Amino acid sequence: MDLLLLEKTLIGLFFAIIIAIVVSKLRSKKFKLPPGPIPVPVFGNWLQVGDDLNHRNLTEYAKKFGDLFLLRMGQRNLVVVSSPELAKEVLHTQGVEFGSRTRNVVFDIFTGKGQDMVFTVYGEHWRKMRRIMTVPFFTNKVVQQYRGGWEDEVAHVIDDVKKMPESATNGIVLRKRLQLMMYNNMYRIMFDRRFESEDDPLFNKLKALNGERSRLAQSFEYNYGDFIPILRPFLRGYLKICKEVKQRRLQLFKDYFVDERKKLSTTTKSMDNNALKCAIDHILEAEQKGEINEDNVLYIVENINVAAIETTLWSIEWGIAELVNHPEIQKKLRDEIDSVLGPGVQITEPHTHKLPYLQAVIKETLRLRMAIPLLVPHMNLHDAKLAGYDIPAESKILVNAWWLANNPATWKRPEEFRPERFFEEEKHVEANGNDFRYLPFGVGRRSCPGIILALPILGITLGRLVQNFELLPPPGQSKLDTTEKGGQFSLHILKHFTIVMKPRSF
């Protein structure tokens, strides 16, 4: 059976090469394409570039081919933007033309071919989903409604750490406890639910399935089948696993959270106009009105599990690592907190706006260790123009936001973790995209609306950890290992580090 499949694939590949040569010649007469390495039929630049399209590799290509270049990855066109001016063109000036989302074989599975909000094409469905999600998730009212819960969650983290004697001597892997905190932060908003401990069976099941989804979707190993359809039969096993994980996750969301909330709302009769609604109540109302269907509801839950929880957790983890590796910055932050609030006065969300050095630490973390360094890929549904070049329809557009924020031509000593830059030469720069050199959350129509949740959670969490503990590397180490691990468009730390947390006395 395998030999028969191989034979059919090779025959198909032969004919595909012939067709690709003809099509390539026809298309080359039509388009003035951006520069890039010379492609070969069928494979394009895939054999030269490989699967690992991370931000650092793409930066090297930008240095060679310029701020706008094209990679032909099999049958897909990949356009990479590496300057603030071109980023403004793609994300703002021509935001409608480039406002769609690219598709691939794995994300089609996990999003039901774009039934969600984050990965759907630009159009009526996206506008409807964005509107439905904004009120329950992405307003200052939501921040004020749930900030007390976020403050409680980090207080639980601090109490739990203080109960672990090893945390002050040999150290602990804090990420595990912070992961529980982030799930509780988001599940309070979504379902008015929280998990009591890391040992909660439902929490562990949820965490395992979300982790498997992230691993499968962020892996580069399926690129060959996505780029070159004739090779897709070799992905059957991989795609089968993706479908199984997708089905198990959606069933878990439905059985344990969505349906449970439906039962609660119909049996208690407490969901009147005066009662506080959680996010799923608003979303279920939209379903009842016929604006969305049950699948859309589940894919909204899927988006929050992926886009809100893990990305914020990665940024917290990076922030801690940089503070441990720069004790002078950690001390300066602690001194600011003690001076402004008074020793032992625990940070709340309103306090974070009175702590400029804390804000600078957050901005510097997001600059140097951008969680989504290439942003979520964009796509033009129709043929478009960019910088005088033709961009064929359905090209995948990557904005190398990490390079925009780390280019030594436009940033002073960008390789250094230096929050002071946001008091000095970059004092006007904010995380909301007011400067196209710095776009940790993107900008424009498809920017990340989660910025309104992420920034206060980062401030509360990093602030309370620093004011309650001295954060140190484990015995025998002078610094933490900050080796990066990239994915399809993610950037997190390779090894979940151990840190020593010495409680402070007030």
UniProtKB/Swiss-Prot annotation:
Protein's recorded name: Trans-cinnamate 4-monooxygenase C4H1
Enzyme's top EC category: oxidoreductase
Documented EC number(s): 1.14.14.91
Any one GO molecular-function label of the UniProt entry: iron ion binding
Gene name per UniProt: C4H1
Pfam assignment, any one: p450
Native source organism of the sequence: Petunia hybrida (Petunia)
UniProt keyword Nucleotide-binding, yes or no: no
Induction (free text): Repressed by MYB4.
